[in-house]
Amino acid sequence: MSTPSTTRNDRWPPQIKFIVGNEACERFSYYGMKGILAGYMTGAILKGGLNMSDDRATTIFHLFVFANYFTPLIGAWLSDRLFGRYGTILWVSLFYCAGHGVLAMNDLFTSVDAKFNLLCVGLTLIAFGAGGIKPCVSAFMGDQFKPDQGHLMQKAYGAFYFSINFGSFFSFIVIPRLREAYGYGWAFGVPGILMAIATIIFWVGRKHYQRVEPTGDPDWLKKVMWMVGCVLGGIGIWYLKTKTSISGFWLSGSLGGLGILALAIFTVRLHRRVDTRKEKLDSSAYVVWWYGLTSPIMGKTGSLWDAASQRFTPKSLDHGISTGRILTIFALIPVFWALFDQSNSTWVLQGNKMVPLQLTGFWKSAFGWFFGDAINAENMQSTNPALVMILVPFLTLGVYQWFGRYVTPLRRMGCGMFIAAFSYVIVAWLQQRIEAGEQISVAWQALPYVFLTTGEVLISATGLEFAFTQAAPEMKSTIMSFWLLTVAAGNALVSIITSVLSSDAAGHSGAVSSGRFMLYAGMTAIVGVLFVLIAMRYRYRDTAPAAQLAAR
């Protein structure tokens, strides 16, 4: 009997077009709203804005982005345990649409307080919607490919990534133009319409999708109640902090201490209760790293991994070792995201103090329909996705191929840190000129955008590659969730720094100042040095059997 030959199916799954179309429209809606958000919060009341200070607007903006990258944990749980990926994407998208709708209602009110309340409700719904579907969409696309179509996945994800930048590029061009012509109501409303279209496109393909059923969770109600309790507790703490004379410093410190204590108790209880020598590998595998750290405190001697090896299987120990090393690298990444996401906040606020680039002659004929008579700070944000679409193939197919094995993932990421830091040196120099009273063109911002975007490609794209190749097979989804948390942590860092170094405090400049930009540049350079030192000691994961790894 002849052995059947392995065949390849070169036909794309027909449902992929619905997923890619959904992603392009969703990204247009998200970045279109995000691109005008800083200007809306700081804009004059007569022009429909909220007239906030730069510091307050920066804090709110980055808390919103933080929520966008923290809520994927909720979306992943809903997807894996209750609704499945299709159900989660569809139903959570409705909250997303509602958030845009709430923001679009701002023109119906004249009271600044009413508009601010709408802003809070709208951003909360959008954060839950955008974050909730984030871990589901790309994984759902992977579910559509059969084993004989695996060779098509790289091209499909390339189209997926291109759709993200395609949607964001045009949103930074079109939405500011709508804002100038029709006000913030339509500028927030059109992204909502695009999100509704994205949801409809996704729903239309429902009969073609391959769906992975959720595993279920018998304790889901307890977990939901616990989460609701946390939210209500947070609201209560916020009320106490704002309505009483309790020092915010001591309140935050006490809450932080209680959080650390709760985490320590949870870790001790977990590693006493779980024994992976008797149980199948589950989510307890990645806490082996914590176990190795806490065992010496509890009186055990020997190396950290010797202590862990007394309780965990070689396979679990291997997962703990690889996860611990990856998390050590990830711990330094948030500072980059603190820089990168300010391109939509403080950079826009800086650009609003610069002179718009007037379009004349050929340039007006070619680009006047997109930009109008001039390119402003909000339009300049389109520089980033445009550069990404150029730099990714240039670096991947050119630079990386040329230097070969010398361009390791960690070397790329370390280089990206210093390049991103240098972009803020340029931004600080531009801000010094503005503070000196010079009238400079917003076109100057293209220069730091080149360096910041290069840093993004070197760190973001490479970081995903590094995490995927270095994580144990069963831990890849967990590691990807930690990667998203680095973005959340970076934006939380900006909010904290802006609050602590508020311009209202004596001796501190505002969020948009040369001193603040240099602070971020110096901080990133220092972290870059630490990153290089740690990367030099990093041992890349090899293919040694788990039994050999356990003997280390």
What are these regions (language model features)?
Residues 92-114, 418-437:
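C-terminal ends and interior cores of transmembrane alpha-helices
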Residues 34-35, 70-77, 105, 165-181, ...:
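A gly/Pro-rich, aromatic-decorated transmembrane alpha-helix motif that marks the paired
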Residues 1-18, 147-148, 154, 176-373, ...:
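Intracellular loop-helix junctions on the cytosolic face of multi-pass helical membrane proteins
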Residues 47-66, 152-158, 247-254, 323, ...:
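Loop-to-transmembrane helix entry
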Residues 24, 98-99, 112-133, 430, ...:
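Hydrophobic core of transmembrane alpha-helices in multi-pass small-molecule transporters
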Residues 132-148, 457-471:
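Intracellular juxtamembrane helix-capping segments at the cytosolic ends
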Residues 59-80, 169, 382-395, 489:
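Central cavity-lining transmembrane alpha-helices of secondary-active solute carriers
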Residues 72-95, 101:
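Conserved MFS/SLC helix-loop-helix module at the cytosolic interface between two early adjacent transmembrane helices
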